[in-house]
Amino acid sequence: MDLLIKGATIITLDGENEVLKGDILIENGKISEISQSIELSKEKMFATKVINAENLIALPGFINAHTHCGQTILRSYADDLPLYEWLFEKIFPAEEKLTKEIVYYSSLLGIAEMLKCGTTMFFDMYFHEDMTAKAALETGIKAVLSRGLQTDERQQQRLDETKELIYNYSSDKIKVFFGPHSVYTCSYELLEKVAELSEEFNTGIMIHLSESEDEVNQCYEKYDMSPVKLCQKAGLFTRPCIAAHCVYVDDEDIEILAENGVTAVYNPTSNLKLGNGFAPVFNLIKSGVNVAIGTDSAASNNNLNILEEIHIAALLEKGMYRLPEILKAQEVLKMATVNAAMAADIHNTGRLKKGFSADIVLIKANDLNMLPCYNTISNIVYSSNPSNVYATIVDGEILYMDGRLLTIDEEALIKEIKSIEKILEESIE
């Protein structure tokens, strides 16, 4: 069924006149018209669902540009630890216990949370990624997926699984990238291989990059260069590349990222929680680097609340540089929409524009924490939270509305998650 969103305050993020009052007509999953008033014929009205949006804000659906959806099941399992101890002593061993079925339900849990936050697309790196793909297709959310790659006895198996993902799941809803985990878990030879394969399969790459001081120091000890320079040397930046974190990057690194069109994904909460410091986002943007926003996983955040991430992202840079005028609200909002779509080389989402996919979030404008409203974009960035999300729409399909998930049985999911929790409590330390 087609949709007509009537009387909304519309944030288009599409150049001039980015905030307007009007209607959005959605036909066959695409935005067919945005104007002050759209009148439908009687015949057309019967085939169109009308949403009264007089007290709603319509804006592009949020894109979570870095997470590990299958890891949601490890929320609160390993907290208050530095990155390497958290990863190698707790997370990696626990992940050995995660079956395909567990990753499927974990992915459903993560997707349910993201839909309630207004997320319409997420970028993901994990294992059993076919299960995350299955969950995404069943629920209607869009995704850019990568099977995490490492150098060990299963290296070739992981590469083969990536190829299978590309063959089996590439579609309008799902893109598949190659996903070398990091320079400290992948050999240089594997990084080179990934660059070759991504060229062969005409796809992109996502990687954790310069997340911690330990990573950078180890890279210098082993290769006598920074992680950024190593990735450039290996050829990763010849392909569309999404680099999560980029916390410890110097001016030369930033110049390399900018010159090669690499997207840096800002994950402020995860960086703070793991004690990894503050990404120089202002310097990255000033130098011409495309910057998006991600939550990272629920095991390191500990939520997938993109609205919270947008809020923290806007505030941290102002405090770090002691410059309240930097990273204005509109710029941060674009990081979670326009910039993220650009990162994955997707050109039909991230804005509300005629011909674009109808990936839309509706926010309640009359909730107490959203009043008064002198600046709509500022209220989204600095005031909103998931309780304000009225509807999440992907390709014109309503996936979440007025407190209800429409493509997920929430009660059944909760039952499954609690059952898995009991199993994992007995099998992981």
Swiss-Prot record:
Its EC number is 3.5.4.28, 3.5.4.31. Binds 1 zinc ion per subunit. Zn(2+) binds at residues 66, 68, 208, 296. Transmembrane segments: none annotated. Substrate binds at residues 95, 147, 158, 181, 211, 296. The keyword Nucleotide-binding does not apply. Its cofactor is Zn(2+). It catalyses: S-adenosyl-L-homocysteine + H2O + H(+) = S-inosyl-L-homocysteine + NH4(+); S-methyl-5'-thioadenosine + H2O + H(+) = S-methyl-5'-thioinosine + NH4(+). Keywords: Hydrolase, Metal-binding, Zinc. GO terms for molecular function: 5'-methylthioadenosine deaminase activity; metal ion binding; S-adenosylhomocysteine deaminase activity. Catalyzes the deamination of 5-methylthioadenosine and S-adenosyl-L-homocysteine into 5-methylthioinosine and S-inosyl-L-homocysteine, respectively. Is also able to deaminate adenosine. PANTHER family: AMIDOHYDROLASE-RELATED DOMAIN-CONTAINING PROTEIN, AMINOHYDROLASE SSNA-RELATED. HAMAP family: MTA_SAH_deamin. Belongs to the metallo-dependent hydrolases superfamily. MTA/SAH deaminase family. This is 5-methylthioadenosine/S-adenosylhomocysteine deaminase. It comes from Caldicellulosiruptor saccharolyticus (strain ATCC 43494 / DSM 8903 / Tp8T 6331). The lineage of its organism: Bacteria, Bacillati, Bacillota, Bacillota incertae sedis, Caldicellulosiruptorales.
